[in-house]
Each structure stands twice: as C-alpha cells, then as structure tokens.
C-alpha cells in the first residue's frame, strides 16, 4: 500500500483511500477519520474547549455532572451518559452506571479474590466494573 500526504493550507482536509476491497485496515482508517471529526465541548471552570472523541479516556458521572477525562485534563460535559453512549463509537464500553471507558486506553484489569474487576486506564484513572457488565466486557475484548 502506498501513502501520499499533500500539505496545502488552502484546501479543506480530506482523506481518500483507493483500495481493491474493504479490509480491516480501510475500516480502521475510516474509524480514525470519523472519530477525529467528532468533537465535544468540554468546560474547565468557565472556559470552553473542543475535545476530540479519540482523545477521551473515559466519561464519568459524579455529583450530577458528567466529565470527560483525557490524558491530562478533566472537562465537564453538558450531556448525560446515555446521550454520550449514542455519540461515541464501539471503542467505548459502559463498565458501570457512572462510567464509560475507551477500550483503546485500557492499561490493565485488576481482579480480586472476591470477583471484583477493576479497570486501570493508561492515564492512571481506575474504576470498578459492575458485576452485570463483566460478561459483556469480556466478550467485547475477547478475554
């Protein structure tokens, strides 16, 4: 496969892929492009920031607010978790009533003798998987 990048400040960004058939690679390129195009507005105090969906490690509901957690920041989002579930792609999984994680940002799982499963993300954030979601997560991740 050949790759060609043309930088022209006067053009609108566009990705064109020529392929004989749809493959896992072309699907991955499509997913990356679509996710980078999706953005949310997040707030830190009174300042608003654009956040790409692909930058988000997880969404957490706390104290009647929803937060998007990225590698270095925590943004308040003016949407509910159920609304975010409709916006994000298949790389996000709801692990409990108050947390949706990006599976691409999972560093590891910690399990205890009592059967509790904890997800640890690459940025250090961790949360517990509810018992009813353990089976779903294992199936989705092929564990």
Question: At which residue positions do the language-model features occur?
Answer:
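Conserved residues at beta->alpha junctions
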Residues: 19-20, 71, 97, 131
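Active-site-adjacent beta-strand anchor residues
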Residues: 18-19, 78, 127-130
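Long, highly charged amphipathic alpha-helices
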Residues: 24-31, 132, 136
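Long, contiguous, secondary-structure-rich segments that constitute the structural scaffold
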Residues: 12-13, 39, 136
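Conserved binding/recognition cores within well-folded domains
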Residues: 26-126
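Hydrophobic secondary-structure block in the mid-to-C-terminal portion of proteins
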Residues: 119-143
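A broadly conserved detector of short glycine/acidic/proline-rich loop/turn motifs that flank catalytic sites
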Residues: 21, 81, 133
């Amino acid at each position: 496969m050949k790759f060609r990048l043309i930088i022209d400040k006067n053009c609108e960004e566009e990705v064109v892929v020529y392929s004989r058939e749809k493959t896992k690679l072309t699907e991955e390129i499509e997913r990356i492009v679509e996710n980078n195009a999706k953005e949310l507005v997040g707030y830190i105090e009174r300042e608003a920031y654009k956040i790409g969906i692909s930058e988000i490690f997880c969404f957490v509901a706390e104290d009647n607010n929803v937060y998007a957690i990225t590698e270095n920041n925590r943004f308040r989002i003016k949407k509910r978790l159920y609304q975010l579930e409709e916006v994000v792609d298949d790389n996000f999984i709801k692990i409990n009533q108050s947390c949706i994680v990006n599976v691409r940002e999972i560093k590891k799982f910690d399990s205890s003798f009592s059967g509790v499963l904890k997800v640890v993300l690459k940025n250090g954030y961790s949360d517990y998987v509810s018992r009813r979601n353990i089976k779903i997560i294992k199936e989705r991740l092929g564990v």
